[in-house]
Amino acid sequence: MHSLSLISLALLSPLLVNAQLSGHVGPLTSSSSKASTKTCNVQDYGAKADKETDIGSAIEKAWDDCAEGGVVYIPSGDYAMFSRLKLSGGKASAIQLDGIIYRTGSDGGNLFMIEHSSDFEFFSSTSQGAIQGLGYEFHKDGSLNGPRLLRFYDVTDFSVHDVALVDSPAFHLSLDTCKNAEIYNMAIRGGDSGGLDGVDIWSENVWVHDVEVTNKDECVTVKSPAKNILVENIYCNWSGGCAMGSLGADTNISDVVYRNVYTWKSNQMYMIKSNGGSGSVSNLVLENFIGHGNAYSLDIDGEWSSMSTVSGDGVQLNNITVRNWKGTEEDGAARGPIKVVCAEKAPCTDITIDDFALWTESGDEQTYSCENGFGSGFCLQDGDGTSSYSTVITETAAPTGYEASSMSNDLSTAFGTDASIPIPTIPTSFFPGATPYSALAGAASGNAAKATSSATASRFRHRRGSH
């Protein structure tokens, strides 16, 4: 168990205080304690590991017995799931997925939806549990109308860890109006198509760390409303890339940190996307990014043409820090590594771009383009946003220190949309040189009961030695 008092928090660096977690994250009770209270093995409720019998009713019955204190246990084996589950309420409970669940049936909705719950954990004690969505069965016909794999709504004090989410017909993992969550030690692997988001967050006080995402849309993305979000040690491995948005009317996002993000062969390293709208984004830090082979690098686009224009003057962006970015981009002349386009009636203010060194993989020049963005660094102009401007700077010399490490598991090609995607092994490295905050649960012990005790309770773990 790790915890950090608010007094200790105040003594840490200003960065820690101003723009990340506001308190503890994760469940309040360890899964081992929950299991000792009660364990509901789904096989005792009719589940069969035959890859044919619908496991849904067995999970529902087990949940009814263990939701108020206990663990719903899904042993190793292959299970079919035709049902679309909505598990509501409960406290001091967990779902231990050590088997593999295969989506069957063509209904949409959510394969798993957890709502109105607290002190909850969804995990695998072996790090081999998975949900296989078999989304290609929809995607090969051009359809995105299948179910999302895992969605949380109005859940507090919870974690999701050591599970793989594979080939969702739609989104993989969504956190909707949740609080005090920790997401870690996960592999998410989707098809090469838009609409197959990895992790989407519109919640408060959430820590996402040590997660790998492969898809063609969002890697780990913050949506509105959101506050106190910390995203660390992220591996966007042939993905859409991390982002914020799309942002529309009444945007309300603040105190967000992305740190140690490695992006390979993706659409962008980080994008903030809007077109019109209202509200604000404030206190955003994007630091320690490495990228290779991406179409865009830093892409702040207040006139994003891929979304319909929303009524309003634009979303106000304020106090954004971008620092320590290294690597290469695909074509720096066609799509330069810095693009900051802000609305004329809602200019971006107090933006800092520092220690930023990327170079083109094609050709011998790259551009930096800024429009109505005010602050310091590269093409940004000093000012308070009372005047408008647009400028493009062309760079013909590679910046000093742009070279950056790569990851040994970088994919050589994307996964398609017309064949089954294999279930991956959860990696033990997510960013060059960074040690994951938690060992995989399956590495702790071969004994499932002992492995569950590795889950943390009421913790606020801070970055070790990174201040």
Curated annotation (Swiss-Prot):
The active site is at 217 (proton donor), 292. Glycans are attached at residues 237, 252, 319. Belongs to the glycosyl hydrolase 28 family. The keyword Cell wall biogenesis/degradation applies. This is Probable rhamnogalacturonase A. One of its GO terms (cellular component) is extracellular region. Keywords: Carbohydrate metabolism, Cell wall biogenesis/degradation, Disulfide bond, Glycoprotein, Glycosidase, Hydrolase, Polysaccharide degradation, Secreted, Signal. Pfam families: Glyco_hydro_28. Coiled coil: none annotated. One of its GO terms (biological process) is pectin catabolic process. It comes from Aspergillus oryzae (strain ATCC 42149 / RIB 40). Its EC number is 3.2.1.171. GO terms for molecular function: polygalacturonase activity; rhamnogalacturonan alpha-L-rhamnopyranosyl-(1->4)-alpha-D-galactopyranosyluronide lyase activity. Residues 1-19 form the signal peptide. It comes from the Eukaryota. InterPro entries: Glyco_hydro_28, Pectin_lyas_fold, Pectin_lyase_fold/virulence. Disulfide bonds join 40-66, 219-236, 342-348, 370-379. The keyword Membrane does not apply. It catalyses: Endohydrolysis of alpha-D-GalA-(1->2)-alpha-L-Rha glycosidic bond in the rhamnogalacturonan I backbone with initial inversion of anomeric configuration releasing oligosaccharides with beta-D-GalA at the reducing end. It is found in: Secreted. Pectinolytic enzymes consist of four classes of enzymes: pectine lyase, polygalacturonase, pectin methylesterase and rhamnogalacturonase. Hydrolyzes alpha-D-galacturonopyranosyl-(1,2)-alpha-L-rhamnopyranosyl linkages in the backbone of the hairy regions of pectins. Its main location: secreted.
